[in-house]
Structures are given as C-alpha cells and as structure tokens.
C-alpha cells in the first residue's frame, strides 16, 4: 500500500501486459503518475475488475485522404495499377473540404476503436497539389484532443517522372510534413526515386516510410537498395517499408536472409493485411496465394514490424472500419498464428508500431501520457482471440469515448 497521493484519476485493478497481476494506475496532469498493486487517493476511480488496459493502438500506415471513395469510382478494380489509376482520375476534383470530411469519418472510427497514435500518408503531386495536405493538417489540429496524427508526404504516382512533384514535396516538408514516403515501383527511374527521397529525408531530418515490393515476383526487388541507403546514410531505425508482399513469396532460406538484411539495416516492415490479401494473387485461377508477409516471423528474426489499416473503402480495399484490433485478429487468422503467438500479434498493433514510429513516450509507465484504452477481456491473448469491445478510451487522462456493453434481454 502506498501513501495517499494527489491523483486526478485512478484505474482500479487494471490488467496490463507488463504486470502479472492487476494493478492500480494513477493519473495526474494528463500523465501516468504511479502504478502499484494499491494506490491510496481520494481521486475519481474507475473500477475495471481485471479488464485489460493498453496504451492505445498505433496505426503506422493509413490513407485518410483517399478513404471512402467507393461511391465515386465503382467497384471493379482488380490490380494495384487499376486502383492507382482509379484514384488518380478523381484526385483533380478533390477539395480541402471533401478530403477533410472523408478523413474525419475514418479518423472518428479509428478513435472509438482505440487508436491513439497514427501516421497517415498524404498524396502530394501536381494533380491534387497541397489540398489533401492542408485538409489532413486541419484534421491533425482539430482531433489532437483524441489522437496524435503524423503526416507522411507521399508521391503515389512517381517522382522523377512527374514534373513538379519534387517541389510540392519540399513545400509540404517545410510546412509540417513529419515523414516522407515513396513508391519506387511507380517511377520510371526507381533508384533515382529512392535517392531523391533519402536526400530529402536527410535535408529535413524526417523518417522514410515507403510503399515497396508490392507484388509476388521475388526475382527482383528494391529492398536491397533501401537497406543500402539506410546503412549508407546512417538512417537505421528511421526507415519503414509497407506491403513488401514479395517477402511472402520467398522460400524459407531466402526469407531468413532477407530478415537478416532488414534487421541489420534497421529497416522496419508494415504488413497491410486487408489490402495485401485483396490485391495479391489476382492472376491465379485456383490455389490463390495469400500474398501476406508474416510479420511476426520477421519479428522473431529481429525486424521491427507492424500491422496497419492502409485503405478504407476505396479501390485498394473496398471495406474497412479502421479498427486495428480487428486487423490484428484478421492477420492472426490469415497468418495461421498459433495461440502461443497471439500476444505477438497484439504487439504488432501496439508496442512494435510505436517503435517503428520512434514514439519515445508510448506505453504504460510513470511519466508517459495517460493515453489508455480499456478492453472487455482479461488478457492480450483474449484481445486477439475474442475481438472484445473497446469499452473506453482516454487521451492525456481525459476520457474521449465510451462504449456501452450490449445487454441480452431475456423473455419474461
């Protein structure tokens, strides 16, 4: 038992991944002030009775600017290229207000599903200019009370082959872009594309987060060049690649070799199950490959990995609700994860993506922000197995949502 301390809020009997038995979590000034088996205080109390508390989900890869487009473009887009073309045809007509409204819809779904940190890719090119960027900046400002939103500026349709794209990227980086993305497989000169992006990353001191190796042909890839750039520029721990579905097509020995290379270069991998599964293997007539890279197996080999949302209700992924818990469960199903691997699957949407984004103040520890969510289960394993409700969420100690449990109404 601890002496009485001035807290603003105490969570009683919370289960957390770091403690074997339930603990009390004391919050003061928007931060976690103490964790102990029993805290004495006259503060407001929330009795959790052994429910799981997490420091919120972390979504490392989503596209808020092109979410919720299905009603505008039809549903017949079977390949990556067709999806890119469909969105490119619409971008010229995007307005700041339109991007804001669609992005807000998805952002609110993510918040009530327990996401507290998010990196969104924002397309920057001569078609849309900086309109999407301005809209997402406004979302970052307007929803800061509930979620930390980080902007990764991103030339979807290439860089060296798209006059004016480079200048727009620089303008966005000068105006608040916090990471730089890229898509070398869409550029006529992929190596120059990567060179330019790393130049900009160094010039503006930002992380690199790429779309990479997004097919199932393992005979060629850009992974080697990304690792080389990361090591040559001492950018280890500041580079991530999304999709990387080619890794799913490798035999075991080559998969192991790729993992060693990624770990040595400090290059992280983000797997995007909904999109990767939806778009890969489209040419197969039977025995269709999953096209899903096994992130938890890469983690076992020393690679930092995450599972993320990517797209929501657009040609790349015509469904989605921005729930990272659902995505982690989906990943575990498709990856055929064993029960003993469920905790590792939960790590892919919590602690590991926090490492990928270099979030130094993430986690349930004294001094960190009181960004907490409560799940209707008693363990991390249960979170993956059961898909429990996320009952409530807090940002800097302030409650931002609550979900009422369903009540069964028996007859009589």
Residue spans of the language-model regions?
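His/Asp/Glu-enriched, well-ordered alpha-helical/loop segment
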Residues: 207, 228-239, 275-279, 289-377
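N-terminal metal-binding scaffold of metallo-dependent hydrolase/deaminase domains
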Residues: 1-41, 380
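Histidine-centered catalytic micro-motifs
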Residues: 56-67, 122, 207-216
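C-terminal cap of metal-dependent C-N hydrolases
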Residues: 355, 366-412
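Histidine/acidic residue-rich metal-binding segments in metalloenzymes
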Residues: 131-145, 161-268, 285-307, 362
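Alpha-helical scaffold segments that flank or form the walls of functional sites
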Residues: 70-121, 127-142, 167-174
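Active-site gating loops and adjacent loop-to-helix segments of metal-dependent hydrolytic enzymes
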Residues: 68-99, 171, 176, 204, ...
């Amino acid at each position: 038992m601890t002496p009485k301390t001035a807290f603003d809020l105490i969570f009683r009997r919370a289960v957390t991944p770091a403690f074997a038995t339930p603990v009390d979590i004391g919050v003061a000034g928007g931060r976690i002030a103490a964790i102990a088996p029993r805290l004495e205080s006259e503060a407001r109390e929330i009795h959790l009775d052994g429910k799981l508390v997490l420091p919120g989900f972390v979504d490392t890869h989503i596209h808020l600017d092109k979410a919720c487009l299905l009603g505008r473009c039809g549903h017949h887009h079977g390949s990556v290229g067709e999806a890119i073309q469909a969105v490119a045809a619409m971008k010229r007509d995007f307005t700041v207000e339109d991007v804001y409204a669609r992005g807000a819809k998805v952002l609110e779904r993510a918040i009530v599903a327990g996401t507290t940190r998010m990196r969104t890719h924002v397309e920057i090119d001569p078609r849309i200019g900086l309109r999407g960027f301005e809209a997402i900046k406004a979302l970052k400002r307007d929803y800061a009370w509930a979620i930390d939103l980080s902007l990764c500026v991103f030339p979807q349709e290439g860089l060296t082959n798209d006059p004016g794209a480079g200048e727009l990227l620089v303008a966005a980086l000068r105006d608040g872009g916090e990471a730089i993305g890229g898509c070398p497989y869409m550029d006529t000169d992929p190596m120059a594309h990567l060179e330019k992006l790393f130049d900009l990353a160094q010039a503006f001191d930002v992380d690199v987060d790429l779309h990479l190796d997004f097919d199932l042909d393992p005979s060629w890839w850009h992974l080697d060049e990304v690792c080389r750039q990361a090591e040559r520029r001492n950018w280890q721990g500041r580079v991530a690649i999304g999709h990387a579905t080619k890794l799913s097509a490798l035999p075991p020995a080559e998969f192991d070799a790729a993992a060693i290379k990624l770990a040595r270069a400090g290059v992280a991998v983000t797997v995007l199950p909904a999109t990767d599964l939806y778009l890969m293997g489209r040419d197969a007539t039977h025995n269709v490959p999953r096209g899903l890279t096994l992130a938890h197996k890469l983690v076992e080999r020393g690679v930092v990995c995450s599972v993320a949302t990517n797209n929501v209700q657009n040609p790349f992924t015509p469904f989605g609700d921005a729930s990272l818990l659902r995505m982690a469960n989906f990943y575990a199903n498709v990856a055929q994860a064993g029960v003993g691997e469920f905790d590792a699957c939960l790590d892919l949407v919590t602690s590991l993506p926090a490492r990928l984004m270099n979030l130094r103040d993430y986690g349930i520890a004294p001094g960190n922000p009181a960004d907490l969510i409560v799940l209707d289960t008693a363990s991390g394993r249960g979170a993956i197995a059961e898909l429990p409700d996320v009952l409530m969420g807090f940002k800097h100690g302030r409650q931002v949502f609550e979900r009422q449990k369903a009540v069964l109404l028996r007859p009589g």
